[in-house]
UniProtKB/Swiss-Prot annotation:
Name of the molecule in the record: 4-hydroxy-2-oxovalerate aldolase
Residues that hold Mn(2+) according to the record: 15, 197, 199
Enzyme Commission number(s): 4.1.3.39
Protein species of origin: Pseudomonas sp. (strain KKS102)
Pfam families linked: DmpG_comm, HMGL-like
Membrane-spanning ranges: none
């Protein structure tokens, strides 16, 4: 049994933004942050779903700017630290400085699981600002445990004090998680913390988070009602209930989280955050969870099945940042269906 305090990192106001196409109002953000703060989570991540400056044609326009959301949270929190997410190439060090000035004190610098080298500038600048810098290795199922650990070691060398296994596709099994944390332990300094960011596409979000803690993981990402991309993240209230049952020290107020999940967050969902045919396809095919809403829009526009688009994206091993390829895949599928339709027509012949 683990006796250490588990660091609870809430992502409702960042990853959860994907579930409602980045349309949180400032008042909703303020209300949710206040509930989370009173429930004593350790940090609250705030940004567009795709991180600082993610609001764009490619990723979807936000109802407000990142700074407006961060300032709203800063106006109500008294206990939790404010975190934000930055993807190099989308957000810049100038955006990071603005987020710091607005109240963010932790930045998770996110890269694809094989591209840790592009995080150097941003991690170093975060440390220069006095921020806590966290390395966030997305789509972790696409790398071997040892390969992922070497990428984490790079982030550590740049100044990251915590490195995450990020299951962006919700595709990792419990053994997959176990092996990745053991690989991290083999190469990272003892003082470098580790974290798990799970998605629930195979219904393993909570189970994988528990396995991570059993393997010595320090931090768990979770969200109220699982609010997040795809089938959502590990539901915060469910993970906390499980941790409570196991006698783990989490420091949060379970009933307050349960009330916030059902009374405040779940009613905001315009599409239920759950495991269904489409979100299951994400986990099965190992597809970036935030592709869901974009793929549904493309399927509706071109008269296709969302699942077919997602499975093809997985076959092509598309990764975060390639949202523009979703329409290309849809058009290719449409062309293929038309080709099959033409060649399936019976050929008429004239009798002699």
């Amino acid at each position: 049994m683990t006796t250490k305090k588990i660091y609870i990192s809430d992502v409702t106001l960042r990853d959860g933004s994907h579930a409602i196409r980045h349309q949180y109002s400032v008042e909703q953000v303020r209300t949710i942050a206040k509930e989370l703060d009173e429930a004593k989570v350790d940090s609250i991540e705030v940004a567009h779903g795709s991180g600082l400056q993610g609001s764009s044609f490619n990723y979807g326009f936000g109802a407000h700017t990142d700074l407006e959301w961060i300032e709203a949270v800063a106006s109500v929190v008294k206990h939790a630290k404010i975190a934000t997410l930055l993807l190099p190439g989308i957000g810049t060090i100038h955006d990071l400085k603005a987020a710091y000035d607005a109240g963010a004190r932790i930045v998770r610098v996110a890269t694809h699981c094989t591209e840790a080298d592009i995080s150097k500038q941003h991690i170093e600048y975060a440390r220069h600002l006095g921020m806590e810098a966290v390395g966030f290795l997305m789509m972790s199922h696409m790398s071997t445990p040892q390969g992922l650990a070497q990428q984490a070691k790079l982030m550590e060398s740049y100044g990251a004090t915590c490195c995450y296994v990020v299951d962006s596709g919700g595709a990792l099994s419990m053994d997959d998680v176990r092996m990745r944390f053991r690989a991290f332990k083999d190469v990272l300094k003892p003082e470098t913390e580790t974290g798990i960011h799970a998605h629930h596409n195979l219904s393993l979000g909570v189970a994988n988070s528990i396995v991570a803690i059993e393997e010595g993981c320090d931090r768990v990402d979770a969200s109220l009602a699982g609010m997040g991309a795809g089938a959502g993240n590990a539901p915060l209230e469910v993970f906390i209930a499980a941790a409570e049952r196991m006698g783990w020290h989490h420091g949060t107020e379970l009933y307050k989280l349960m009330d916030a999940a059902d009374d405040i967050v779940r009613p905001l969902q315009d599409r239920p955050v759950r495991v269904d045919r489409e979100t299951l396809a994400l986990g099965y095919a190992g597809v970036y969870s935030s592709f869901l809403r974009h793929s549904e829009a493309a399927a509706q526009k071109y008269g296709l099945k969302t699942m077919d688009i997602l499975v093809e994206l997985g076959r092509r091993r598309m990764v975060g940042g390639q949202e523009d390829m979703i329409v290309d895949v849809a058009l290719d599928l449409l062309k293929s269906l038309e080709h099959e339709r033409i060649h399936a027509q019976p050929v008429s012949s004239e009798a002699g």
